[in-house]
């Protein structure tokens, strides 16, 4: 799995890892049942501490994106259609409000939605 981490950003590295895995799932690059790298392997590939990857995986588990089994490893979970969780709804509303306040037009936002849901 190829992650692009930017150590110059204010965004914590564990969160960059988490966000890129979520985007990979949304884009279909990571599919249900797919085995993810071990914490050690991903940490080595990214050049980060194992605790950083462990924190990202822990958050992904809490959010229901992945499952870890000591023998089977860490796999992407199947996601069924369901109601939008309130924290995601709030973040989405804030992001859309910020885009509108910044002068972004409706078509640009709709193009982004189509890109994610393609």
Write out the residue ranges for each language-model feature.
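Extreme N-terminal segment that seeds HTH/winged-HTH DNA-binding domains in transcriptional regulators
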Residues: 1-35, 41, 86-118
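Short, cationic-aromatic polyanion-contact patches
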Residues: 14, 72-88
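Intrinsically disordered, low-complexity segments enriched in polar/charged small residues
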Residues: 23, 45, 60, 75-76, ...
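Beta-hairpin "wing" of winged helix-turn-helix
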Residues: 29-34, 61-71, 76-78
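Short loop/turn and capping residues at structural boundaries
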Residues: 35-36, 54, 71, 80, ...
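N-terminal helix-turn-helix
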Residues: 36-67
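Short Asp/Glu-rich motifs
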Residues: 43-44, 79-80, 118
């Amino acid at each position: 799995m190829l992650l692009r981490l930017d150590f110059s950003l204010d965004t914590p590295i564990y969160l960059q890892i988490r966000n890129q895995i979520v985007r990979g799932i949304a884009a279909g690059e990571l599919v249900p049942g797919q085995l993810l790298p071990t914490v050690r392997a991903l940490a080595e590939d990214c050049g980060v501490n194992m605790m950083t990857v462990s924190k990202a995986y822990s958050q992904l588990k809490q959010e229901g994106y992945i499952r870890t089994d000591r023998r089977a490893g860490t796999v992407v979970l199947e996601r069924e259609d369901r109601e939008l969780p309130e924290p995601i709804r709030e973040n989405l509303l804030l992001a859309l409000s910020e885009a509108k306040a910044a002068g972004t037009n409706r078509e640009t936002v709709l193009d982004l939605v189509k890109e994610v849901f393609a």
